[in-house]
């Protein structure tokens, strides 16, 4: 498999070639190659244990390198960069009756559709985050928003803080969401509860006196009863 340095050199050569032909440079909002590679290396051992027959079909080192390359690309392009996401995919993989290794695209779909210990995935967090941000004008405070579950409140409020402080791009926001989700899943796995959303109790409405119209009507009725109207 190509080293990180070689991958970077190839990327630079491609960018220079594009500029030479008056084409725009290409940038991908994705996790660092090193981080994705670390996650995949841990997954590789689990795949060998879950699908030993399929993994034995790799006859040469070249076959194995191509397999790694395709899976690494799929992970990097689809935002799979935490072990929480991979664990979610492996839970579904181990339930499969067929002993065949899933395709990279199929495994990525499993990672995204299955939540971890909280039953929530990154896509759901991002969707609820933007719904909250787009509807924030409807509520007095963030606590009043109808969160699907308390952990969404804690994650989204922290996401807003990080996004404002660091001016995150959409891809960076998704990665931060994955990191926060991973952190909360570890807390739950360790037996720590998710704090509830503490909504402030509304102050009692102040008693209001009669309106000017009511005062005039009362005066009219008094005058009428006294024969003055």
From Swiss-Prot:
**UniProt name for this protein:** Probable helicase loader
Family, according to the entry, reads as follows:
Belongs to the phage P protein family.
State the protein's purpose. May load (host) replicative DNA helicase DnaB onto single-stranded (ss)DNA at the origin of replication.
* Transmembrane parts of this sequence: none
> Please, what other remarks does the record include?
Its C-terminal half might bind to the gene 15 protein and its N-terminal half might bind in addition to bacterial replication functions.
Taxonomic superkingdom: Viruses
Q: Which UniProt keywords apply?
A: DNA replication, Early protein, Host-virus interaction, Viral DNA replication
Q: Where does this protein come from, organism-wise?
A: Enterobacteria phage phi80
Q: Does the keyword rRNA-binding apply?
A: no
GO BP terms: namely:
DNA replication initiation; viral DNA genome replication
According to the record's subunit comment, the protein's assembly and interactions are: Forms a (host) DnaB(6):helicase loader(5) complex in the presence of ssDNA.
């Amino acid at each position: 498999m190509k080293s990180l340095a070689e991958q970077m050199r190839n990327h630079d050569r491609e960018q220079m070639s594009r500029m030479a032909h008056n084409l725009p440079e290409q940038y991908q909002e994705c996790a660092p190659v090193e981080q994705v590679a670390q996650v995949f290396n841990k997954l590789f051992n689990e795949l060998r244990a879950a699908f030993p027959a399929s993994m034995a079909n790799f006859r040469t080192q070249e076959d194995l390198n191509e397999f790694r390359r395709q899976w690494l690309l799929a992970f990097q392009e689809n935002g799979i960069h935490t072990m929480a996401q991979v664990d979610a995919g492996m839970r579904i993989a181990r339930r499969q009756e067929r002993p065949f290794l899933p395709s990279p695209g199929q495994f990525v779909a499993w990672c995204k559709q299955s939540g971890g210990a909280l039953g929530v995935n990154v896509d759901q967090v991002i969707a609820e985050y933007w719904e909250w941000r787009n509807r924030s004008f409807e509520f007095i405070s963030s606590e009043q928003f109808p969160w699907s579950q308390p952990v969404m409140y804690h994650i989204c409020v922290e996401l807003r803080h990080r996004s404002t402080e660091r001016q995150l791009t959409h891809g960076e926001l998704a990665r931060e969401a994955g990191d926060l989700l991973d952190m909360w899943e570890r807390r739950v796995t360790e037996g720590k509860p998710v704090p509830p959303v503490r909504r402030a109790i509304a102050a009692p409405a102040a008693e209001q006196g009669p309106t000017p119209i009511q005062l005039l009507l009362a005066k009219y009725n008094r005058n009428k009863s006294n024969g003055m109207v």
